[in-house]
Amino acid sequence: MRLLLLLAFISVIPVSVQLLDARQFLIYNEDHKRCVDALSAISVQTATCNPEAESQKFRWVSDSQIMSVAFKLCLGVPSKTDWASVTLYACDSKSEYQKWECKNDTLFGIKGTELYFNYGNRQEKNIKLYKGSGLWSRWKVYGTTDDLCSRGYEAMYSLLGNANGAVCAFPFKFENKWYADCTSAGRSDGWLWCGTTTDYDKDKLFGFCPLHFEGSERLWNKDPLTGILYQINSKSALTWHQARASCKQQNADLLSVTEIHEQMYLTGLTSSLSSGLWIGLNSLSVRSGWQWAGGSPFRYLNWLPGSPSSEPGKSCVSLNPGKNAKWENLECVQKLGYICKKGNNTLNPFIIPSASDVPTGCPNQWWPYAGHCYRIHREEKKIQKYALQACRKEGGDLASIHSIEEFDFIFSQLGYEPNDELWIGLNDIKIQMYFEWSDGTPVTFTKWLPGEPSHENNRQEDCVVMKGKDGYWADRACEQPLGYICKMVSQSHAVVPEGADKGCRKGWKRHGFYCYLIGSTLSTFTDANHTCTNEKAYLTTVEDRYEQAFLTSLVGLRPEKYFWTGLSDVQNKGTFRWTVDEQVQFTHWNADMPGRKAGCVAMKTGVAGGLWDVLSCEEKAKFVCKHWAEGVTRPPEPTTTPEPKCPENWGTTSKTSMCFKLYAKGKHEKKTWFESRDFCKAIGGELASIKSKDEQQVIWRLITSSGSYHELFWLGLTYGSPSEGFTWSDGSPVSYENWAYGEPNNYQNVEYCGELKGDPGMSWNDINCEHLNNWICQIQKGKTLLPEPTPAPQDNPPVTADGWVIYKDYQYYFSKEKETMDNARAFCKKNFGDLATIKSESEKKFLWKYINKNGGQSPYFIGMLISMDKKFIWMDGSKVDFVAWATGEPNFANDDENCVTMYTNSGFWNDINCGYPNNFICQRHNSSINATAMPTTPTTPGGCKEGWHLYKNKCFKIFGFANEEKKSWQDARQACKGLKGNLVSIENAQEQAFVTYHMRDSTFNAWTGLNDINAEHMFLWTAGQGVHYTNWGKGYPGGRRSSLSYEDADCVVVIGGNSREAGTWMDDTCDSKQGYICQTQTDPSLPVSPTTTPKDGFVTYGKSSYSLMKLKLPWHEAETYCKDHTSLLASILDPYSNAFAWMKMHPFNVPIWIALNSNLTNNEYTWTDRWRVRYTNWGADEPKLKSACVYMDVDGYWRTSYCNESFYFLCKKSDEIPATEPPQLPGKCPESEQTAWIPFYGHCYYFESSFTRSWGQASLECLRMGASLVSIETAAESSFLSYRVEPLKSKTNFWIGMFRNVEGKWLWLNDNPVSFVNWKTGDPSGERNDCVVLASSSGLWNNIHCSSYKGFICKMPKIIDPVTTHSSITTKADQRKMDPQPKGSSKAAGVVTVVLLIVIGAGVAAYFFYKKRHALHIPQEATFENTLYFNSNLSPGTSDTKDLMGNIEQNEHAII
């Protein structure tokens, strides 16, 4: 079946738009020299690698799922067990069996296990899960040395649509076809789109793809003056980093605003909007100030009053249309819309000279660079105005700086000193908040200090200085007397013959104590190193910021892309070292570097000039050699001085200059990364930076000594600005790494800080900076430790007398108990509040931090609801103008998640079924605590539409009495919703009785709204009510299914039909066709239909009438009273009558006598109206009394009491005559220690429920016992069998002797004519389902595959004792009925013939497929013979076998 389903799934996948795909790769095993090949959905093997073969192409479609490009299905396994087969499945992001991860040394396996993707063991052709981690479990991307995660998943963020910019889900289903890429299907305009859930047909959520397609220019607004394109994504809800990723997917970037005209244009463009939009401005770098993503200069300021806030973590900026398009800084993890920008950034084109057009010729004391001359005036300090005049007198101007290379030249070669503070030409004197160069050149580059430009305290800080150890910029009051830098155009364009710098050979450049040479050939890292060695030099090292600046100015403007440095981790992966024996004192990594990359380090040119990338050492690039200049006196070795001490309880080693201390805090005292950094700074230190294994071992010793195993600690590691990789917050080099495997992964684009796990591996992980952790501080040896800061007041908010926490104008209650949403809200309202409404990031952050520190791990309900049309509303009716959804949320899972919770670990929100018990947050205004509680609004009475049944304030209708009404669970729910209702939620025993009462005439089970689709074993009502009442049938949930796993049974039915468990619940597969029950609220506009009672007081139900007698009598007097009123004391023969009786007595809340009694029938409980006891509903520990009368208690269960007690009682009238049992015919059943035969009429029956068999095996088991599989010839026999198997329903269903022959005729195995049938509705069905089972729960028949494993029923005639008298005459026909047939007879041979051919006719291929499903029952080496004969304890004798096989040959023509 699985094969057919998957092939059907594949057949509907159309050709969709194929992206030019670096995402695709081949999975390669180096030892086998073979690639994974998906031959079919159930066969994943290997083959000779062929990059053109679609069947060998795979790609990641989520962070942990790999999809076959050919089949659009995902790699998965049926179970997390050794030797499970890896095959292809419909992609399911929630399935644990489809989640893969890369492990150390190219191992690849199921996530969270030590089971690896393996090929070649045990000569198995298919890929398997295997515990071994040898070479056959190691996989790479074909053609590379990289593991499979190097081609990891990149989320594609959708545009417009109705999914709030959610990530495209691949593959997704549209009109029952599957798409693995963006498509234009269904659109006349050709626009490419994607579903944002896997099933668009169900969820209807979509967005357009961030790709170029015909008409995609309409997604952009073009400024007619500049030609720049802008895209306003106001409907999206993404974090800052996600928004930037979305822009970059369109070859754009987040908005940068460099001109006043641009801001005015955007103000008009966004004027109709009100909520904030992300722009590219940020202060993510720990070393520099405000900057635009993408590198545009930050020269125009448009801050909202009060912004930028200095609050830690508010590092990203939004443009707020509702506040005149002003800017404000927020936490980067907030989810907002955003603006993308594409095109030139300036109206004034300006060409920065390249290294090839650099003229020379400058006056004395001036330094040449790229066509200009520069000079620092340090001693003669002037205010900015006079410094400008002085530069102009010399023929120049205050320096303008237009690139990182020019900046680094000034910083490194002009004699800049760390304590300098020098005027440059940037200022906003002419136009406030709009910086310009005094020489009139365009502003193309800025390099601000942290927190700059500030216009601090609203002072007129209109001029700019270059200051500090890094030479970054700050705005200052122009009247301060400072030094200054002048710049002028080169005086001469004549090329001066190049001479040798002092102490260097010709062609080498001098800087400080060293000479440098740019290599002339493209070389690998090794060849470049050899070349430098031959020049008596070495590949360059970089000791500090100044040397880096010199090298940037040396190579940054050159046309080559990379230049090798001497840094690599080839000796020890993860630890970067220079080729010479020098300590790594400085690093300058590019974005995403070094990450998990291993290799050699090269310096980049161009826009990212000077930044370092890790490349394959075999790549070819130019290089820079370095050696000591001649005549330089090398600095002496440092003299040994006594090592400074560390503060008490701090750890260190002689190999580091730092002291370290752990701050392992309780839950209430953990901090965010920013708070931890500020704490460490306050005591004179910094968050720890780990630069070697020695320092890591120091921290490990601290962990072991304090017992802080497995705790998580903040490090100073942070992913800074978009142009940088991970950096240490103290500015030290990132030369040593110890990332956990697969990290850093920036999961969901919100992980920008580093933590260390306190286990022996000491591995690092990137995580959301707002997470609460312990932390590790470091301090320089010998430095004085400052006092620890006192906690801020807001860390310990005041609390009211009744336990509510006060924050601003509101009070909050944080529950410790879990409740459904309805109960939680009732509690809040009882205490003059409601579930919390969250209106701002600060409020969200306060609540999140409080529950993180003080609450449990479970989420908390807040006061948001999601309507059926997926709109958001606050319960108090206030406007939704702030949201904080977690990534991928709301996902409307199962279309029944209408409530919202806040995650404890992140503060983000998730949609959830309202009936799922959670903690909750109540909110009330400070002024509400003295208020009077609002009166409860009475329920408005109303009626139901025709055909619906009224019970209290609900209307019910049962569908399924007509076969065409039956539906799958999802279709049934949609049908109910179409009737303005939902599938029924049964909230108490009274409602259950009402439903059972109305299902009396059903022959079907009926869907309810209960399901565990979203979370296995967590059953919830789809309408969102709490699950406070259940009525599971015996063995449910999780009763056995024929050829179905328990996990497949996710939806719940009320059992109907003539089962003794009618009215109880059973979980079943959601796609099976069943009846269903809809529920709606009453309609106040409809009248309530009055109920009438007949004059005689008897109400008809079914074929009987009942009357509740409201007077208390002893049992015997009650019986007499009923007889005097032409009725009898009521017998209750099935669950329906029980529900009816309980509903009649429930309003009076008193017990009632019923007709069950044991004191009149020799202590056997029987119905006094002579009906057979086939149904009981005993209460716990009943029946207690041996001789007693029985009453129905107020809870509907039956209990025993002495008959002289006085109760109400139920009388019953009925024209039905109790069925009499057929007389037992003479004879007896076989006696055996192994088998227990049960007599009925003229036959004996054996019920086998403990050992299941296929139909063929069951047939021969019966034959071995001298019987045959049961034939059912009368309704009485059917009732007898149903009664006997019903108690066994939780064990198995039972084979009977009916089969379908090749002509399609149904026959009994013993050749009896088919004169009676009892098919389940919808059966018989299926071309290959040729054998019949009797369902234990209902007694009905259904046909299934003959190789399924079931219990079975054998039948044989009673054995007649021999008699010596001649008075009894027996006919031949009677003799045939009563005499058991000998095993070697032709009848037995005929049976065996049928059995053999039925099994063959059932299909060998399908048999072996089912053998796999039932591996626990079927021997591994099953053959045709031993499957049929040799599973039993006894095998046929030789003579029997000979006779049987001979008869098979003789009778073969009769069957085929």
UniProtKB/Swiss-Prot annotation:
Glycans are attached at residues 104, 344, 529, 926, 930, 1159, 1204. One of its GO terms (molecular function) is transmembrane signaling receptor activity. Residues 225-341, 369-487, 511-626, 655-778, 807-923, 951-1079, 1101-1212, 1240-1355 form the C-type lectin domain. It is found in: Endosome membrane; Cell membrane. Disulfide bonds join 35-49, 74-91, 102-149, 168-194, 182-209, 247-340, 316-332, 391-486, 463-478, 532-625, 600-617, 680-777, 753-769, 828-922, 899-914, 976-1078, 1051-1070, 1122-1211, 1189-1203, 1262-1354, 1331-1346. Keywords: Calcium, Cell membrane, Disulfide bond, Endocytosis, Endosome, Glycoprotein, Lectin, Membrane, Receptor, Repeat, Signal, Transmembrane, Transmembrane helix. Residues 1410-1456 are cytoplasmic. It is a single-pass type I membrane protein. Residues 163-211 form the Fibronectin type-II domain. One of its GO terms (biological process) is receptor-mediated endocytosis. Residues 20-1388 are extracellular. InterPro entries: C-type_lectin-like (IPR001304), C-type_lectin-like/link_sf (IPR016186), C-type_lectin/snaclec_domain (IPR050111), C-type_lectin_CS (IPR018378), CTDL_fold (IPR016187), FN_type2_dom (IPR000562), FN_type2_sf (IPR036943), Kringle-like (IPR013806). One of its GO terms (cellular component) is cell surface. It comes from the Eukaryota. Induction: Down-regulated by interferon gamma. Residues 22-142 form the Ricin B-type lectin domain. Detected in macrophages. CDD domains: beta-trefoil_Ricin_MRC1 (cd23407), CLECT (cd00037), FN2 (cd00062). The chain crosses the membrane at residues 1389-1409. Residues 1-19 form the signal peptide. Pfam families: CysR_MRC2_N (PF24562), fn2 (PF00040), Lectin_C (PF00059). Mediates the endocytosis of glycoproteins by macrophages. Binds both sulfated and non-sulfated polysaccharide chains. Acts as phagocytic receptor for bacteria, fungi and other pathogens. This is Macrophage mannose receptor 1.
